[in-house]
Each structure stands twice: as C-alpha cells, then as structure tokens.
Amino acid sequence: MNVPVLPPIPTDEVSPLPVAERPARVATRGGALDLLRLLASLLIVIYHFGAEGPMRIERFGQVFSRGFLATDFFLMLSGYVLGRAYGASTLTGRISHGRFWMRRVGRVWPGHLIVLAMMAALVLVLNAIGTDAHKPSRFAWDQLPVQALLVHAWGFNSDGWNLPSWSLSALVVCYALFPWLWRAADKVRRPWILPLVGALAFAACEVVARLVFHHALPDLQFRFGVVRALPLFILGVCLARAVEMEWPSERAAKVLLIGGFVLLVAMQPLDRYALPDELIFDLPCLTAIAAIVLGAGRLPVRHPKAWIEEGAKLSFALFITHIFVGVIYWSAVHKLIETVPIGIGWQWLMWLASFPIAMGAAWLFHTYVDQPLQDRLAPWLRGKR
C-alpha cells in the first residue's frame, strides 16, 4: 500500500507572497519534512518486505501492518509540496495548467516506465528458466498495458507488476486538478478554515467509499485509488495554503508536531479491525498525520542537514524500484532456503540485508537513470526548447 514520493521543491517557484512582499528565502530542504519523507519510504519497504522474513513481522507490532499510514502521509505531502512549490506560479500565470500537468507527469512517468520495462524483462527471463519463485500469477501480461499507461487507479484492474504505482496513477488525476484546487484555496481568507475544508473533503469521500464500494477509504481496492488519494491530496493543498498565510504560529506548530507524533504512536497498539468501526482508528491517525505535516511545514528549517536532503531525494527512486529489487532478491533467497539448510538466524540476517540492498539499488537508479533522464527532459518540460 504505497505511495509516490515527490521530487524536491523547485527553489525558484516557492512564493507564498506577492513579489513585493516576499521575505528573504528560507531553507526548505534538509529538515523535518524531508526526514519524515525518508522514514515513511522506509516504512513502506518494510511493509512490503515484511512477509518475506522467517515470520511475518506484524507479529512484533501492529505498526508493521500499516503501510497505508505511510501512504496517507505521502498523498497528503504531495498536495502540500505542490502547493508550496507551484501555488504562486499557477495564480500568476507563470505556468499554464497544461504545462504544469506535463511537468508533473514528466517527473513520474518516465521512471515508472523504465522500471516496468525492467520488470517485464525479468519476468520473461524467470519464466524462460522455468522457476516459479517469483510467483508468476502476480505478473499477468494483460494487465501490463493498463499499468504502463498509469490509468490502473482509474477503475481498471491491475493488481500485480509494480503494484505501489497505483498511487502514481491516482496522483496523475490530482495533478490535473491542482491549479483549480489552489485557486479555490486562495480565496479563503481565514487560514483556520482551510484544514476544516480538507477534513470535509475526506468526510465526503469516506461516505462515497462506504456507500458505493462498501469499504473505508484505506481499504479500497487499488483500482479505485483516485477516490482514496484525492481527499488526502486536497487536505495537503489546504495545509500548504494555511502555511503560506503564516498560520499557525511557530509555537503552535511545535505543539502540533509533537502532539501529532504522540497521538500517532498512541494509536498503534490498537487493533483497527477489532474496533466497532475503522474510523475510530482512522480519524485520530489522519488528524495526527495532518498535524505533523502542518507543524513540520510551518517551522523554518534552521539547521538543514545534507544527509536528510539526499535521503529524501532517494525516496521516489526507492518507491518505484523496491518491488523490482524484491522480486530478484526474494526469488533467489527463497530458492536458496528451499535447497540448502539455513538456520533461522541467517534467514533473519538475509531479511535485514534486503533493506541496504534496496537503498543501494535506489541510489543507483536515481544517480544513473532517473536524474540524468530528468536533466535531459527538463528543457522540454519547461518549454525552453
């Protein structure tokens, strides 16, 4: 249950105030939000690799079965980051609606296609070898075109291949709506109203999910990902506009950040499905995540850390490559365990080794594939060629 990680905020496009009123630029990278982005991406990998160890790791704690919380964070953060990065540009007309959408799709689609092509080639090789260690049923060829086109969260069924990319598909729709959403948020003059607007959007989509699909929002099938992603994206946009209006105060932001963490941690021992209704768990967690995003976003980054910024930049690459890496690694590991007696301790070590391997692969992809490709595409996406 994963979600895309956004690229860095373009430093030339963050403008919360009219030109004449802009304060000196403050650092936006290397702070709390970047650290949270990195930690959430790691939680997503842990969630997806959790079933591959000697025993399912949710036995050690409910939090390891809750990848949807990291997904909620990323979807909300997507709206927040775009609001901070592109909000002013969409209002002033410096970037057109179509150009904005092309930039956003151009950021996520090429990398997605490359990883999907590598995955298809890998499956062909594994099928030719005759192994079933990669669980061939997960790779139905008739579902590949839908996923390649990034429309599999628009009601089309595609539950295999690079499964977490459903959130990219959903965000493509959110990107198309962003300029209108930001203009609507810009009309609100009292910043405290904005989080309430986001909460109402979530409530409306929760009602739709229950009446039409008979599930709570986090439990929707991935093919209905747009319904799940849109309210969280809207809430992120609303929080970004509130921060641009310098709300709340820095003191209140610290309280929100700490209080959000405390509430989120306090909810984790609860069994979500043992409660009378999933909302008893979902609403406090959503409130906590929103408080964390708002609090961390409002606080200035006074001591940016380069390692945090670089780690956050890897989050998108980690998101789109970890399933591909997992297919290779876990196919080999499970085949090895089937053929050679390996103690439980060594099996746990092999499980732990999967995380630095996934991070290393993400770094290679980011450094030698995704970033060079983005550098090549940038002039066209910016309309300079």
What do the PLM-derived regions correspond to, one by one?
Residues 72-74, 231:
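His/acidic/aromatic-lined binding-pocket segments of jelly-roll/cupin-type domains
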